[in-house]
Amino acid sequence: MLIKVRVTTDARAEKVVKKSDDLYVVSVKEKAERNMANRRVIEIIKEKNPGKRVKLIKGHHSPAKIVEVG
């Protein structure tokens, strides 16, 4: 399953908001440097989907990402 993720970096608090079945808005405390924010986004999505494989498909350098969960 492919989901769209809109990421806000350097946030005060981490949170996940599900806008629709395939659109999430994720705020992370990490800065968008050295892939730290991307790694944290993947960790958060894994926590929400235990036992599933999570892979970043598109948007490595963009706040709009496409992630494969499955």
Residue ranges and their predicted role:
Residues 1-43, 47, 51, 56-70:
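Contiguous, often N-terminal, cationic amphipathic patches that form binding interfaces
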